[in-house]
Amino acid sequence: MTSAEHLTKGQQAEDRALAYLEQQGLKLVERNVRYPFGEIDLIMRQGHKWIFIEVKYRQSKQFGGALQAVSRGKIARLNRAASHYMQLNQIDAQCRFDLLAIDGDDIQWITNAF
């Protein structure tokens, strides 16, 4: 798979994740927020709570599923990016970190994942 195809698959997975989460009642704030030290796939709100969401996609579980694809380093970068985002936007509210894992057609939403 070329890098362009990989990016397209990733974008499609994020689109599926967003549609799924909106069906669950979450509201999109921003997507693909990038800093030199980390990226946030989706930033959403549920009431007054801010939710930072990592989306992981795997075509199949043959080489490990989407859940296994989240490393400690990725979690640390997401935490740092979310903290920076909240400071930059002067947000003083509760937040949580969720993981939305997509393996083929299966979607698994883990709230308070890390």
Swiss-Prot record:
State the family it belongs to: Belongs to the UPF0102 family.
Q: What is this protein called?
A: UPF0102 protein Shew_0226
Entry superkingdom = Bacteria
Q: Matching Gene3D superfamilies, A to Z? A: 3.40.1350.10
Q: Which organism is it from?
A: Shewanella loihica (strain ATCC BAA-1088 / PV-4)
InterPro entries on file:
Restrct_endonuc-II-like (IPR011335), tRNA_endonuc-like_dom_sf (IPR011856), UPF0102_YraN-like (IPR003509)
Gene Ontology MF terms in the entry: nucleic acid binding
